Structure formats: C-alpha cells, structure tokens
Amino acid sequence: AVYWRKDRKMQADREAAEHLVQNILDMGEMLLSSGAEVKRVEDTLSRMGAACGAEKVNIFVITASIMATMEFSGGVRVTQIRRISRSPKYDFRRLEALNRLSRECCTGGLLRKSLHKGGAGGTVLEKKLRVWKQGENIRERYLGSLLVTGSFAVYFGGNLSDGLAAAAFAPLICFLQNRFEPFCPNKVTFYSICSFVAGILICVFSRWTGMFRYDRVIMGDMMLLLPGLALMNSVRDVLAGNTISGIMRLTESLIWTGALVVGFMGAIWVVI
C-alpha cells in the first residue's frame, strides 16, 4: 500500500509537471508568434521554469521550434518539443502583455503553486493565455492599413488621389491576409498570389479611370506586405549571437520579398 501511494504521488507530480511545461511552451510559442527575439524567449522560459521550482532548466529556441527539458524534485524530468509552423505576426501590444504576465508568474509564485495545489497555478496561467490566443482586433488592423497605405503613397511622391486610391485597396489586402493566407501552403505562395491579384486590380482601375498613378499606389500598398520587421529582427538575432535563427529569418524575409516583387511585376507586365 505504501508503494502504491508513492507511485500515485509520483504519477500526479509528473502529470502536474507535464501540464506546467506545456503551458510554459504555450507562452513561448505566443511570444515567438508576436515577434519576440529568440534570446528573449529563451530567457523568459528559463526564468519561468526556475520560478516553478525546476532544479535544472534547459531551453533551446529557434524560429521553427522550442525544446524544453526541466528537472523537478523527486526525480521528475519532463522534455517537450513544440513545432512552430506559423510565421510571426508582429503584435507589440500582445507582446507587452505576455511579458507582463511572465513577470507576474515569476514574482508572484503562480507557477510554483501549480506543483503543490493540484495544478491550480497552471490552470490560472492557461486561462490568462487563452485570452491572448483569441487573436488581434480586426477593426484596428483595417484602420491601420488605411492610414499606412495612404500615407506611404503620398510619401513616395504621390498626390492626394494616389493616397486615397492606395487606402481604398488596403482592405482588399487585409481581407486576403485574414481569409486567404490560412489556406496557402506557405508564405511564398500567399505573397505571390496576393501581390499579383492586388497589382492586377490596381493597374486595371488606373487604366480604366486615369484618376491615379498605379506605381505610387502599388508602392503604398506594398508596405502592408513587406517583411521589414522580420528582416530587421533577423539582423538583430545575428548580432545577438543567435546565428541559426537570424539566418533562417533573413532567408525567409528575402524569399518573401522576392515573391512579392514577382507578383507585382507580373501584374504590371500583364496589364500595362
């Protein structure tokens, strides 16, 4: 009976530890998908593992996966790997909220309680993470796209009509990003198709109405698709010593940009 109770306790401790590590990996995945740098994600997950009572914490993060091994008291060792298939969508508001939540977990003892009170701390963390898994505010994204495309079209030498035309085509690009991108096998396919479709419509309406210049409108709308932040983050990762992640992000960004240019140039060649 003594051994049976001991085995039951070890099994319960292991299940609580596995659930806790799963929540910590959820945090890491959301940080990466929000645009956090690799070194920052590794540091955050390591601190959260130490805060929950892990005696040894080993975290390895690249842009495509997260690997975590944690050793707890009583000989409980948990190893989990999380595949990151989605490309990051840079949402600094969510990133700030996740950083604040991670500090709350480390300083408030929220994670440590989950190993001693039936996983209550992990449940609380899971509920808080679920709030930020719901995604971004679509209305704010559409409004921001109108401001960005219109202002950049004017900035690149366009007039008021060019800015208004660029803003008019911005909701189409946002709609394709929200509805069509999840069905594409990769970013290259999406960027090629999205830029070609948007370019065709811009050039056709420009020739049909003659009210705006297609090149200025394309330059303004292109700002919604250019992976500028991804490119800069790749350089930052390389300078910070995360060479593998930096090279992966840099290569992806250059390929995406090439697909974007090919799509718009193909549209101009077909129509003009």
Where on the chain are the PLM-derived regions?
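Generic detector of multi-pass transmembrane helix bundles and their immediately adjacent loops
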Residues: 206-272
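N-terminal charge/polar-biased segments
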Residues: 2-21, 135-136, 250, 259-272
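Juxtamembrane/transmembrane-helix boundary motifs in multi-pass membrane proteins
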Residues: 129-137, 157-161, 182-190, 212, ...
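Soluble N-terminal domains of membrane-associated systems
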Residues: 1-111, 120
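Alpha-helical transmembrane segments and their cytosolic membrane-interface
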Residues: 86-162, 249-261
